[in-house]
Amino acid sequence: MARMHARKRGKSGSKRPPRTAPPIWVEYTVEEIENLVVKLRKEGYSTAMIGTILRDQYGIPSVKLFKDPDNPNRNLTITRILEKHGLAPEIPEDLMFLIRRAVNLRKHLEQHPKDLHSMRGLQLIESKIRRLVKYYKRKGKLPKNWRYDPETAKLLVR
């Protein structure tokens, strides 16, 4: 499949092995995993970093291999665990990381206004932000009146 803002295909990467149940060597229960996720979030880690720590230090390859105790038809996710405990960020993390990139690029362009390649990169990043905002408004993760504004984005990122 082609990239979003390029006409070429990406490099192939490794594929996760197809599993429906946790491996035998995982000795943690669902409650222990939830407690670990909450503990790591309170220490200030992002959801991606929590997943990496669970994989590398605790031997849990993926939280999605475990069934959600509240709804057995769904699998657990780190975001659902954080929402259940009231620790989820108000702005979704992928959107926040894109906003952070845009703010840093704007800061660069203030010092180097003739950097046209970076200007184009900023346009592409802000297109992705607008696309994600539209999606999150439709899903109800963001309020309907939320708008991306570069000036208020500086205050969001800090």
Curated annotation (Swiss-Prot):
MF terms in GO: small ribosomal subunit rRNA binding; structural constituent of ribosome
GO biological process annotation, one example: translation
Keyword flag Transmembrane helix: no
Domain of life: Archaea
Cystine crosslinks: none
Region (Disordered): 1-21
Protein family according to the UniProt entry: Belongs to the universal ribosomal protein uS15 family.
Stated name of the protein: Small ribosomal subunit protein uS15
Organism from which the protein derives: Pyrococcus furiosus (strain ATCC 43587 / DSM 3638 / JCM 8422 / Vc1)
